[in-house]
């Protein structure tokens, strides 16, 4: 993220760091995120209420592309491009080909699906509430949707619009690199940071997920084997 300014001063013998609000995200103003929010919510609703499953998958592809755009605007370029490659290039296209191969009855396409609209709206609101608690407060606090959520919910517990957020140096901060002071000054790329986290702190979870994927492949092969 660009245009993040830091100001340090000495108070009570401790070095404090002031984080000033960030209005620019990856070279773009954060107001552009409102456009992606509205389009993503629209695609998400139409994905659920669409009667034709093929059209529903197309809306799902559009939803994934918009989410990738949000990640790219947030400065997470690697995850945004990975979203397009994995979800759009593999998963969604696989769903689309499967739906084209199976026999879908016309009566199923013409069936009433308006009952799913409340579920679609509830799912979108729940997803946004969870994402709002995960993302940093200074990332989207100037957007329209975030201002509405701040009015009705207290999901952002740090107010940096009037007062700068103060982070004490004595607080525990998790670094991707080792504990050596010289390594903390080295700038990591996103790929290096993700690789260091996956293969050091969360290596056991990486192994567990690999075993789960292996069991899924073996299970699919066992099910499809013809019994003699």
From Swiss-Prot:
Subcellular location: Mitochondrion
GO BP annotation list: mitochondrial electron transport, NADH to ubiquinone
Primary location: mitochondrion
Any one GO MF annotation of this record: NADH dehydrogenase (ubiquinone) activity
A single GO cellular-component term on record: mitochondrion
Keywords tagged on the record: Mitochondrion
InterPro entries: NADH_UbQ/plastoQ_OxRdtase_su6, Nuo/plastoQ_OxRdtase_6_NuoJ
Pfam families assigned to the protein according to its UniProt record, in alphabetical order: Oxidored_q3
Gene3D superfamilies: NADH-ubiquinone/plastoquinone oxidoreductase chain 6, subunit NuoJ
PANTHER family attached to this UniProt entry: NADH-UBIQUINONE OXIDOREDUCTASE CHAIN 6
Name of the protein this chain belongs to: Uncharacterized 25.4 kDa protein in COX3 5'region
């Amino acid at each position: 993220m660009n245009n993040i300014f830091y100001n340090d001063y000495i108070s009570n013998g401790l070095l404090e760091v002031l984080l000033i609000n960030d209005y620019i995200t990856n070279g773009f103003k954060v107001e552009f995120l409102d456009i992606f929010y509205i389009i993503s919510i629209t695609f998400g609703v139409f994905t659920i209420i669409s009667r034709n499953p093929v059209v529903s998958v197309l809306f799902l592809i559009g939803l994934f592309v918009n989410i990738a755009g949000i990640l790219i605007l947030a400065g997470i370029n690697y995850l945004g491009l990975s979203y397009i490659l994995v979800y759009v290039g593999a998963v969604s296209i696989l769903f689309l080909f499967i739906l084209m191969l199976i026999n879908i009855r016309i009566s199923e396409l013409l069936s009433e699906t308006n009952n799913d609209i409340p579920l679609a709206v509830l799912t979108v609101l729940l997803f946004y509430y969870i994402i709002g608690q995960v993302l940093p407060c200074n990332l989207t606090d100037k957007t329209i949707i975030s201002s509405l959520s701040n009015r009705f919910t207290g999901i952002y517990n740090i107010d940096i619009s009037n007062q700068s957020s103060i982070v004490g140096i004595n607080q525990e901060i998790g670094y991707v690199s080792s504990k050596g002071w010289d390594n903390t000054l080295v700038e990591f790329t996103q790929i290096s940071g993700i690789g260091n986290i996956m293969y050091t702190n969360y290596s056991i979870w990486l192994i567990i997920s690999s075993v789960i994927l292996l069991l899924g492949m073996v299970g699919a092969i066992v099910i499809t084997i013809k019994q003699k």
